[in-house]
Amino acid sequence: MAKFLAELLGCTLPEKGASPMFECRSQPHIGLRHVTKQRDKMPQTPPFPVMYGSTNGYNKNLYKAKEEDYEGLYYHDNNLISGSLEALIEHLVPTVAYYPDRTYIFTFLLSSRLFLHPYELMSKVCHLCVDQQRLSDPQADKARVRKIAPKILQLLTEWTETFPYDFRDERMMKSLKELTHRLSTGEDLYRKAVQQMTQTLIRKLTTLSQYEEALAKINSSVTDRLTVLKTKPQSIQRDILTICNDPFTLAQQLTHIELERLSYIGPEEFVQAFVQKDPLDNDKNCFSDHKKASNLEAYVEWFNRLSYLVATEICMPVKKKHRARVIEFFIDVARECFNIGNFNSLMAIITGMNMSPVSRLKKTWAKVKTAKFDILEHQMDPSSNFYNYRTALRGATQRSITAHSSREKIVIPFFSLLIKDIYFLNEGCANRLPNGHVNFEKFWELAKQVTEFMTWKKVECPFDRDRKILQYLLTAPVFSEDALYLASYESEGPENNMEKDRWKSLRSSLLNRT
């Protein structure tokens, strides 16, 4: 994971001919000066238990109006700013008179894994539920149990629906079964609710396992392009234009892949990708025994694959005219991705076209009409912290909010930049304050960013699937970086001594030629 993050955060989207994506040095420090304003869209839990009836919900007027502590929690302007870990855990647990705000539930379940394992949190929650509400007492007031049981079930339902991957841990499932058994005993209504929640969770985990198996199968079937070339004559090699010559159709199929892979990324993966040892924890790293961010990593690897596929398709053709045609085709595909709101595929295509083996093909580029490509590069220009892209992303997000069709709902962010933003938020602000309190102000902002992603990933792709095109995009052999350079030199010869030396070296090592 450390190597993965180093590679991801250390790369740069350069001028033509330089190496990948963006420099982290240009990233400004991310503070929390604007948190209160930004959090207006995130309703928060009232700072003390609020009485509500079965249908009336919260009394929204019962807020503290000044800075003060409340049972280990610190508020400012009605916003929860910090608190001890134990107080925050208690704040998560419903009582007869109180149910935590959904925003607080999501934020705490997301961020708590920086301090303790999810199974440890579940154990504490179960203990508080049983102990505080006397669920273990056979003489417990049944009316009281009937009041608290729906709220505990609702909390567990929100946990299993939003963070289902936590329950791949057998310890989580054990605690869940023990608590739900106490709640459902003797009440047929609660027993059905527990059964429905459990079945939904199992379906999600089964689907995840099937997705991971399919992904592993796809990855194992991918071979190096150069190896294929050695065994098959180039004349019978398939290329992208023989599979699909319509830019709009290809952009739609790319969007299918993007949305499918986005949908399997759990919100917790953004936190677990950067998790470090809590200074107040004497135990080992919380996630040393977890698959921390495998779906997130797989999605970043898809970006890299698409970039290399684009470069491979451009460098493959022998004829200059054909190479120019492929470049213009991908420019049109990139433009359609932009129109759809698929910024990740757009950036992957631009990255592939800016790789040195492609950008050095000057005779080929001379035959290309680059006006549309220049506009797309301008939209994704990394200067001013990707200002142009962020403006376009806000426009796509607004379009999604007011959408009249499923197509208008699509927002697929440039994913590596999203990860980078979250990384710098995490690195720029301490998890704990000097007094040992959890810095919850930081986690409101973290949750805000991840919540936006959660909205984007739930969109269903409205386009028809083309299995042949999808299969090609996912499994077509691609060149390695060295093979790309070799293909580039074979297409347009070396221009200086350094390139000549590299060409000879590559021919010797890759083709066993001198």
From Swiss-Prot:
GO terms assigned for molecular function: guanyl-nucleotide exchange factor activity
Keywords of the record: Guanine-nucleotide releasing factor
N-terminal Ras-GEF domain location: 76-206
Pfam families per record: RasGEF, RasGEF_N
Summary of the tissues where the protein is detected: Detected in oocytes, and in embryos at 4 to 120 hours post-fertilization (hpf). Detected along marginal blastomeres at early epiboly stage and throughout the margin at the onset of gastrulation. At 60% epiboly, strongest expression is found in the dorsal shield region and is restricted to the epiblast. Detected in the anterior border of the presomitic mesoderm at the end of epiboly. Detected in adaxial cells, in the somites and in the nervous system during somitogenesis.
Top-level taxon: Eukaryota
Presence of keyword Heme: no
Residue stretches in coiled coil: none
Bilayer-spanning residue ranges: none
InterPro entries associated with the record: Ras-like_GEF (IPR008937), Ras-like_Gua-exchang_fac_N (IPR000651), Ras_G-nucl-exch_fac_CS (IPR019804), Ras_GEF_dom_sf (IPR023578), RASGEF_cat_dom (IPR001895), RASGEF_cat_dom_sf (IPR036964)
Record flagged with keyword Acetylation: no
Gene3D superfamilies registered for this protein in UniProt: Ras guanine-nucleotide exchange factors catalytic domain, Son of sevenless (SoS) protein Chain: S domain 1
Every Ras-GEF domain range: 246-494
Biological process per Gene Ontology, one example term: Ras protein signal transduction
GO annotations of cellular component type: plasma membrane
Function: Guanine nucleotide exchange factor (GEF) for Ras family proteins (in vitro).
Protein known as: Ras-GEF domain-containing family member 1B-A
Lineage: Eukaryota, Metazoa, Chordata, Craniata, Vertebrata
